[in-house]
Every structure is written in C-alpha cells, then in structure tokens.
C-alpha cells in the first residue's frame, strides 16, 4: 500500500486533511512549537534563578550562607526544570523539522513516545513545583508548632529570587500540562483517521 508514492508500514497512518483540518493541524503544530520553546526558555530561567541563588548573612559575628542545596526541594526543582528544558529543546527541533518537511505520514509508535514523554515531564514539573512551593511556605511563614523559624526574615534576597524561580517553574508546569493535552490530541486523532478511512470503504 502506498500514499502519494510513499510506502506505508503498519505503524504509520496517512492522515487525510480537508481544508479546515489543514488549518487546525497547522495551528496545533504552531502552538506545540511555541509551548516547547516557552518551556525551554522558562525552564532554563527557573534553573538558573534557583541554582545561582545565594546570600550571606552575619549572625552573632558568624557568617552563614544560604544556598539552594540547603533545601532538597529546590535541588529537585532545578534538576526537573533542567530536564524539562533539555527535553523541550529536542522536541522543538523535531517540530521544526516536521514543519519544514510537511510530512503527510505520522508514526503511531512515535506519537505514543511523544505522548508518554510529555506526560512524564508534566508529572515531573508539577511535582517539583508542589514540593518547592511547600518548602517556600515553611521558609516564609515558619512552623511555630515545630519551632521552625521564618527563614525569609533573615534571607530576604535569597527568598525573593527563589520565589521568582518558582514562578517561572509554575509556568513551565502549566505549559507542560497543556502540551501533554496537545500530544494526546495528536496521538488519538490517528485512530480517528483510521476509523474514518474504514467507514469510507463501506
């Protein structure tokens, strides 16, 4: 079997488009590319803001330095956003290559791989933001019952920069969730294309 002279393996599905579907497909691809670029940029920004954040405070003639490594949740946040940025960069390159080639065929295994990867990145970034946000609340408000003091009263600059990093990471996680929905749409429309093709045969 062939489509426009191109061999089609069982794992590949020719996607037939009407004029309206072509416009939708183009918009979906563009939205995916924009989101991946946004995630890459914000992920790097979040990792840099948190990873380079330090502040030295002198307490009773003793200098104490606050680093992001003092809180494991912030270490997790830096690693997660670094991974998300690298992943989005690779997927962004794939999107650009696909848009330039304008391929009519789409591989189901590739679609599943992209969908699974986006899902994992979404869970990873959301978990990292949740953990970092909880730690930030403790640092800001303290926990009197456990005699945990308000760290941000002493390390104001450090906390402000961490807050900016968490805000960037939050945008990354939200964008990743939206992107996982787009990849789900791109995957399951292939099965819809197969169903529509079978109906036309009858």
From Swiss-Prot:
Residues 51-72, 131-164 are extracellular. Residues 1-29, 94-109, 186-202 are cytoplasmic. It is a multi-pass membrane protein. Signal peptide: none annotated. Disulfide bonds: none annotated. One of its GO terms (cellular component) is plasma membrane. It comes from the Eukaryota. The chain crosses the membrane at residues 30-50, 73-93, 110-130, 165-185. InterPro entries: CASP/CASPL, CASP_dom. Pfam families: CASP_dom. It is found in: Cell membrane. Keywords: Cell membrane, Membrane, Transmembrane, Transmembrane helix. Homodimer and heterodimers. Belongs to the Casparian strip membrane proteins (CASP) family. This is CASP-like protein 2B1. It comes from Ricinus communis (Castor bean).
